[in-house]
Curated annotation (Swiss-Prot):
Gene Ontology process terms (BP): translation
UniProt function note: Forms part of the ribosomal stalk which helps the ribosome interact with GTP-bound translation factors.
SUPFAM superfamilies: Ribosomal L11/L12e N-terminal domain (SSF54747), Ribosomal protein L11, C-terminal domain (SSF46906)
Family listed: Belongs to the universal ribosomal protein uL11 family.
Protein name per its UniProtKB record: Large ribosomal subunit protein uL11
Record's GO cellular component terms: cytosolic large ribosomal subunit
Keywords: Methylation, Ribonucleoprotein, Ribosomal protein, RNA-binding, rRNA-binding
Coiled coil region boundaries: none
Amino acid sequence: MAKKVIGEIKLQIAATKANPSPPVGPALGQKGVNIMEFCKAFNEKTKGMEGFNIPVIITVYADRSFTFITKQPPATDLIKKTAGVQKGSDNPLKNKVGKLTKAQVLEIVEKKMADLNTKDKEQAARIIAGSARSMGITVE
């Protein structure tokens, strides 16, 4: 018989920087999860992804055990890192803060494809390009 699921927790945590302080500690503590065990497992799994916030979905079971799934970093983080900007434009229609080439967009699509809601690479590229435009980054 499968374990009974008592909750699901969705968080975004900096890679290799999970610790018992908020927001991780309180979110896991409410469900009775061993916080340090999660932090060690998460930090180990996200080695090599430093500099990104990693979305994680934690499934908590009735016996207080847990499993977790890490996703790819948000598209905006990948776009900012590739374009070499700190943050998007405050007025994307007037102020352009960076540029991406079509090849760079396709590189982001390769990393993010599993988390997007399409299987078509061309459609995925349009999604990423739209996100970049809304941040004030031009796509050439």
